């Protein structure tokens, strides 16, 4: 009985540690007229690359071409994604934007009424 509690606690701690080691990023693809290939195939290629490097697509946008991804906190992984997006931009003329996802407010929090 005590061993099962110990295993449950270990799994919980491992899960929390693993979840805290992810960062969320937004990847968008503005419409470009001078592209050498189909934009949708480029987006699918980037999504496949993200999954291959250990990322997870958490949301796909419908109003704009893009998605949100959770990536492991690693400079090497982030640099690899940046290099891939840069290559796609130079090779196919597809503009790619990558930004860290963060909370945004219309007003300074000091103006909020309690």
From Swiss-Prot:
InterPro entries tied to this protein: PBI_I9 (IPR052471), S8pro/Inhibitor_I9_sf (IPR037045)
Q: Write down the superkingdom of origin.
A: Eukaryota
The name of this protein is Uncharacterized protein YHR138C
* Any GO BP: vacuole fusion, non-autophagic
List modified residues, type Phosphoserine: 41
UniProt keyword terms in alphabetical order: Phosphoprotein, Signal
Say yes or no: keyword Acyltransferase present: no
Which residues are the signal sequence here? Answer: 1-19
Any extra detail in the entry?
Present with 319 molecules/cell in log phase SD medium.
State the family named in the UniProt similarity comment for this chain.
Belongs to the protease inhibitor I9 family.
Q: One MF term in GO for this entry?
A: endopeptidase inhibitor activity
């Amino acid at each position: 009985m005590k061993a099962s509690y110990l295993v449950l606690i270990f799994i919980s701690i491992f899960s929390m540690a693993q979840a805290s080691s992810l960062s969320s990023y937004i990847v968008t693809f503005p419409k470009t007229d001078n592209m050498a290939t189909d934009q949708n195939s480029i987006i699918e290629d980037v999504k496949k690359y993200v999954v291959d490097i250990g990322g997870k697509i958490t949301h796909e946008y419908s109003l704009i071409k893009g998605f949100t991804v959770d990536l492991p906190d690693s400079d090497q992984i982030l640099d690899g994604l940046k290099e891939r997006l840069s290559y796609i931009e130079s090779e196919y003329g597809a503009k790619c934007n990558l930004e860290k996802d963060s909370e945004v407010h219309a007003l300074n929090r000091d103006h909020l009424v309690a």
